[in-house]
Amino acid sequence: MPQTIVVKIGTSSLTDPKTGMLALATIGTLVETLTRLKQKGHRVILVSSGAVGVGCGVLKRSERPKKIAEKQAIAAVGQGRLIRLYDDLFTSLQQAIAQVLLTRRDLVDRTSYLTVQEALNAMLDLSVIPIVNENDTVAVDELKFGDNDTLSALVASLVNADWLVLLTDVDRLYSADPRQNPDARPIPLVSSSELFNLQVDAGSSGSQWGTGGMQTKLTAARIATSAGVRTVITQGKTPQNLLKIVAGEDIGTHFEAQPQADNARKRWIAYGLVPQGILTLDDGATQALLKNGRSLLAAGIVAVEGEFTINDPVELRTQTGQAIARGLVNYNHQDIEKIQGQHSTQIRQILGYGSADTVIHRDNLALLIAAEGI
């Protein structure tokens, strides 16, 4: 049965860890494997990191750039070299590809979010393999994905993928970093209920040339599985294992998809938007949201952070700082500060108007964790 498969390969798998030069054997095997998946009738998207790392190799830089403008320039050099290589290799196998460079801004606006979705699906319908990367040359810090793990999960959600496979520099998830802790235990399977409360010592920020790490992959798994996408973390140096994984073999760590995926609009609220502020909730409001699926009332808010206006996205947190949900507000930050802790019937009296009884209606609220996580 044809399936939609999103594959993300990280910089650590695409390049030599010492020199930053391209790992041509790995890339060649990846291209051949993705083409074979296409020949089997599957729809395939590749999310490829490596622009900055490859750019450093081209320019013979020994360290990743720290200045933003320099990084943007080097990314432009590397992206050109990387996509040329992909095009040459896929063309030799008579497989068409398309380059798709995205920024967070493309997903923040609902209209452009849907436009990206339609464009990706059109490419898949044309039997093209889209090759996606963040557009590092124009992305600004406040509107960056931060890493391609998050980007790949959002892409998988956009196209309602069956699989998201994260190719990385370890063969699976461990209870601790196996490169530093000899007692680290492999974790072959994580259920959807376990994932949101999973605590592992997952190391730090990834390779010298990349920005990802195991924590970002766990975040990606949470995003993808909430969209009904089965997610796998596995070794990037053996991309041929993709064929075995899709065929049902237990390779790497598998994260089970949620039995009931969140609807597309709530996924956009939860993960496509960038929160403009934070609302801290009391225990009663936290339980009402997580266990009863209620709207957020002013009475349950104990603190307001940030500056935002009506319909802006905000993050909802417990009093211990745990993020539990995101939503679109019915009032700006100044008005919420005035009505926090107050009964809904008092809103009109306090503000002089009352556009809504709720601060966030449940239709505009998306949970980030399961009720058992509190």
Swiss-Prot record:
<feature type="domain" description="PUA">
    <location>
        <begin position="276"/>
        <end position="354"/>
    </location>
</feature>
<keyword id="KW-0963">Cytoplasm</keyword>
<dbReference type="InterPro" id="IPR005715">
    <property type="entry name" value="Glu_5kinase/COase_Synthase"/>
</dbReference>
<feature type="binding site">
    <location>
        <position position="136"/>
    </location>
    <ligand>
        <name>substrate</name>
    </ligand>
</feature>
<dbReference type="InterPro" id="IPR041739">
    <property type="entry name" value="G5K_ProB"/>
</dbReference>
<feature type="binding site">
    <location>
        <begin position="168"/>
        <end position="169"/>
    </location>
    <ligand>
        <name>ATP</name>
    </ligand>
</feature>
<dbReference type="GO" id="GO:0005829">
    <property type="term" value="C:cytosol"/>
</dbReference>
<dbReference type="InterPro" id="IPR001057">
    <property type="entry name" value="Glu/AcGlu_kinase"/>
</dbReference>
<keyword id="KW-0028">Amino-acid biosynthesis</keyword>
<dbReference type="GO" id="GO:0003723">
    <property type="term" value="F:RNA binding"/>
</dbReference>
<keyword id="KW-0641">Proline biosynthesis</keyword>
<comment type="similarity">
    <text>Belongs to the glutamate 5-kinase family.</text>
</comment>
<dbReference type="InterPro" id="IPR015947">
    <property type="entry name" value="PUA-like_sf"/>
</dbReference>
<dbReference type="InterPro" id="IPR011529">
    <property type="entry name" value="Glu_5kinase"/>
</dbReference>
<dbReference type="Pfam" id="PF00696">
    <property type="entry name" value="AA_kinase"/>
</dbReference>
<dbReference type="InterPro" id="IPR036974">
    <property type="entry name" value="PUA_sf"/>
</dbReference>
<dbReference type="GO" id="GO:0055129">
    <property type="term" value="P:L-proline biosynthetic process"/>
</dbReference>
<keyword id="KW-0808">Transferase</keyword>
<dbReference type="InterPro" id="IPR019797">
    <property type="entry name" value="Glutamate_5-kinase_CS"/>
</dbReference>
<feature type="binding site">
    <location>
        <position position="49"/>
    </location>
    <ligand>
        <name>substrate</name>
    </ligand>
</feature>
<protein>
    <recommendedName>
        <fullName>Glutamate 5-kinase</fullName>
        <ecNumber>2.7.2.11</ecNumber>
    </recommendedName>
</protein>
<feature type="binding site">
    <location>
        <position position="8"/>
    </location>
    <ligand>
        <name>ATP</name>
    </ligand>
</feature>
<feature type="binding site">
    <location>
        <position position="148"/>
    </location>
    <ligand>
        <name>substrate</name>
    </ligand>
</feature>
<keyword id="KW-0067">ATP-binding</keyword>
<dbReference type="Pfam" id="PF01472">
    <property type="entry name" value="PUA"/>
</dbReference>
<dbReference type="InterPro" id="IPR002478">
    <property type="entry name" value="PUA"/>
</dbReference>
<comment type="pathway">
    <text>Amino-acid biosynthesis; L-proline biosynthesis; L-glutamate 5-semialdehyde from L-glutamate: step 1/2.</text>
</comment>
<keyword id="KW-0418">Kinase</keyword>
<feature type="binding site">
    <location>
        <begin position="211"/>
        <end position="217"/>
    </location>
    <ligand>
        <name>ATP</name>
    </ligand>
</feature>
<dbReference type="GO" id="GO:0004349">
    <property type="term" value="F:glutamate 5-kinase activity"/>
</dbReference>
<dbReference type="InterPro" id="IPR036393">
    <property type="entry name" value="AceGlu_kinase-like_sf"/>
</dbReference>
<dbReference type="GO" id="GO:0005524">
    <property type="term" value="F:ATP binding"/>
</dbReference>
<keyword id="KW-0547">Nucleotide-binding</keyword>
<comment type="function">
    <text>Catalyzes the transfer of a phosphate group to glutamate to form L-glutamate 5-phosphate.</text>
</comment>
<dbReference type="InterPro" id="IPR001048">
    <property type="entry name" value="Asp/Glu/Uridylate_kinase"/>
</dbReference>
